[in-house]
Amino acid sequence: MGTTEATLRMENVDVKEEWQDEDLPRPLPEETGVELLGSPVEDTSSPPNTLNFNGAHRKRKTLVAPEINISLDQSEGSLLSDDFLDTPDDLDINVDDIETPDETDSLEFLGNGNELEWEDDTPVATAKNMPGDSADLFGDGTTEDGSAANGRLWRTVIIGEQEHRIDLHMIRPYMKVVTHGGYYGEGLNAIIVFAACFLPDSSLPDYHYIMENLFLYVISSLELLVAEDYMIVYLNGATPRRRMPGIGWLKKCYQMIDRRLRKNLKSLIIVHPSWFIRTVLAISRPFISVKFINKIQYVHSLEDLEQLIPMEHVQIPDCVLQYEEERLKARRESARPQPEFVLPRSEEKPEVAPVENRSALVSEDQETSMS
């Protein structure tokens, strides 16, 4: 019965659908007889000028966040409490089990704006017309260390406010030419060891290209290793003539060294000096300052060098040690007294009469012949 009456009432009601904002009040349509929530209202031509605070409105559902105690203690509700530290067992990490990279897994390179980069066989590389670019370096499509065939390892350095690139692949066998020999005195006074025996042979086809890149490597190494005052120990022993650096190369090194490095150089010790290195320095006097010439010091043995600098961290090549032993052996043999040479008695010559006695004998013979 009630259902039938409700149906008859709904047939007489004209329902019009419209979009209504939930919270913002707006004028009701003129031809509506139903309130938003279904309660009948009077049809008025003027919009309402008051808000209905007593009527039923739709309310949004508000989510209340749980109370969190932001503190560093482990009390209940704190961020450091055990309630927030529940993690599955597979996420537990033991720091001791983490493997650290080996020294061989990383490339050693220096800072101060220097950076390593790989350059493939690109037009930039081929345009430089460098030795070995026309074909593989070893002819079998692989490099010396088994890496990419057309890849070269480069280092970008800044020398004298100019950017240069060093071909590390070409100078790799000669990098031992410059080493750090520790410190002397108080502070960071570095000892730079230059071993001439590790220089390339002048008969190599790419000798000038190698020396140019090796020159940049030596200069950049000095700028990285030197912090304050320093000295250079030049190991000249066991170096054949074909590996001696030329005058032009030494002149270029001196001219491109930064003024700070030239000023902070306190001594240049030349160990086992040869006549060639003395001649080179004598010829180089016109373009070398007098202050630099006064810093040169000659040392003839490693024993004398030990009296000047600490030798704990100075790496002496094996060929230089062997050269030192040969020199000491030759010096001992030359200092040994030589035995006097005495003729045996059977080989002794008969005594010769003096000149006066000989003239007397001649006169006696003449007298006997005249008589």
Swiss-Prot record:
Pfam families: BNIP2, CRAL_TRIO_2. Residues 171-328 form the CRAL-TRIO domain. Gene3D superfamilies: CRAL-TRIO lipid binding domain. Residues 11-29 have a biased composition (Basic and acidic residues). Cleaved by CASP3 and CASP7. The potential C-terminal product released by CASP3 cleavage may inhibit the ERK signaling pathway through MAP2K2. It is found in: Cell projection, Axon; Cell projection, Dendrite; Presynapse; Mitochondrion. SMART domains: SEC14. The record marks D105, S106 as: Cleavage. Residues 115-120 are annotated as: Required for interaction with KLC1. One of its GO terms (cellular component) is cytoplasm. One of its GO terms (molecular function) is kinesin binding. Its main location: other. It comes from the Eukaryota. Residues 42-53 have a biased composition (Polar residues). Keywords: Cell projection, Cytoplasm, Disease variant, Mitochondrion, Neurogenesis, Synapse, Transport, Ubl conjugation. PANTHER family: BNIP - RELATED, CAYTAXIN. Functions in the development of neural tissues, particularly the postnatal maturation of the cerebellar cortex. May play a role in neurotransmission through regulation of glutaminase/GLS, an enzyme responsible for the production in neurons of the glutamate neurotransmitter. Alternatively, may regulate the localization of mitochondria within axons and dendrites. Interacts with KLC1; may link mitochondria to KLC1 and regulate mitochondria localization into neuron projections. Interacts with GLS; the interaction is direct and may control GLS localization, negatively regulating its activity. Interacts with PIN1 (via WW domain); upon NGF stimulation. The interaction with PIN1 and GLS is competitive. May interact with MAP2K2. This is Caytaxin. It comes from Homo sapiens. The lineage of its organism: Eukaryota, Metazoa, Chordata, Craniata, Vertebrata.
